[in-house]
Amino acid sequence: VPVTDENQTSGWVSTETIVDAPYRNTTEDQLRAQFAREWRTGATLETYILASQANKVLNGRYLDERLTCSILLGSRFEGGPVMGQFYTNGFLLVSALLAPGGHTRSLGGRSEGGR
């Protein structure tokens, strides 16, 4: 089963460039509410990969490099959002978010878009 995107983004896209995941210790529902307040949507896996590669070139580190993971509400696998994390060697770990109500200090979320 492939990963599918909820958002179809084209052109310029803004996203967070902070290395450690923003919005940590929030649930899937809390992330959706936060992004809606900011006129943003959950980042897709494609946006996450592109932003992380750009961050590596510009700042020397991948997004979520080893210490945090990001929920990517814009991409889904078997009905639920996916999580992403990069390692220092550029390896990308993508997994399904198992519990929508789950939250930890090392798990955050990333958004895209903007006003």
What are the functions of these language-model segments?
Residues 1-41, 45-115:
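A binding-site-centric feature that preferentially detects glycan-recognition modules on secreted/surface proteins
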